[in-house]
Curated annotation (Swiss-Prot):
It catalyses: 5-[(5-phospho-1-deoxy-D-ribulos-1-ylimino)methylamino]-1-(5-phospho-beta-D-ribosyl)imidazole-4-carboxamide + L-glutamine = D-erythro-1-(imidazol-4-yl)glycerol 3-phosphate + 5-amino-1-(5-phospho-beta-D-ribosyl)imidazole-4-carboxamide + L-glutamate + H(+); L-glutamine + H2O = L-glutamate + NH4(+). GO terms for biological process: L-histidine biosynthetic process. Its main location: cytoplasm. One of its GO terms (molecular function) is imidazoleglycerol-phosphate synthase activity. This is Imidazole glycerol phosphate synthase subunit HisH. Pfam families: GATase (PF00117). It comes from Leptospira interrogans serogroup Icterohaemorrhagiae serovar Lai (strain 56601). It is found in: Cytoplasm. Coiled coil: none annotated. Residues 1-210 form the Glutamine amidotransferase type-1 domain. Heterodimer of HisH and HisF.
Length: 210
């Protein structure tokens, strides 16, 4: 069974619908025992980094996720679920005295806002994916270099560990990690469930891998 985490983030329906194309053995849940008994975990959704981590910490779900990862089971983060895989983010609530928020820390790197001096922020719409280390990739099998995926975000990873990056995106000549894969940790900055053929192929690859 695949557990799709209910942690208060938005835009969940399209993810559930896309996963259902490849398996009926999944559940949208925040129940700790259900997550512990799952064979894979997906962190979906749109939202803010600080709120996502606040929800995970206050509900004890962070410890449950850590236990899942330590056991070697696959974890897949999408959009905000991708960003919280990293060490920290500067996306904090207005009025907060903190300079950054701690993430799950499974992938080295920090989440920072696009500077937006010469281009529009947020980055919304279709963009090409530059594939790296395709022979090492689980998610990108059968997907061609420069394929288009759908993005919507204002923040991106910086100083990310190179060996974990299997896909990059170029937004106004600023390259940022868009796909990471490290042992049993997987993530995409874009929304595969909104990315039509290529996105659905990526989701299928993950589900077949489990």
């Amino acid at each position: 069974m695949i557990a799709i985490l209910d942690y208060g983030m938005g835009n969940i329906h399209s993810c559930l619908k896309a996963v259902s194309l490849y398996t009926k053995d999944f559940v949208f849940t925040k129940d700790h025992s259900t997550i512990e008994n799952s064979k894979a975990l997906i962190l979906p959704g749109d939202g803010h980094f600080d709120k996502a981590m606040e929800n995970l910490n206050s509900t004890g779900l962070r410890k449950t996720i850590d236990k899942h990862v330590t056991s070697g089971k696959p974890l897949f983060g999408i959009c905000i679920g991708f960003q919280i895989l990293f060490e920290s983010s500067e996306e904090i609530a207005q009025g907060s005295k903190k300079e950054q928020i701690e993430g799950l820390g499974y992938i080295k790197g920090k989440i920072k806002k696009f500077h937006g001096k010469d281009f529009k922020v947020p980055h919304i719409g279709w963009n090409r994916l530059q594939i790296r280390r395709k022979d090492k990739s689980v998610l990108l099998k059968g997907i061609g270099d420069q394929s288009f995926f759908y993005f919507i975000h204002s923040y991106r990873p910086t100083d990310a560990e190179g060996n974990a990056i299997t896909g990059l995106c170029d937004y106004y000549q600023e390259k940022f990690p868009a796909v990471v894969e490290k042992n049993n940790i997987f993530g995409t900055q874009f929304h595969p469930e909104k990315s039509h053929t290529h996105g659905l192929k990526l989701l299928e690859n993950f589900i077949r891998f489990i």
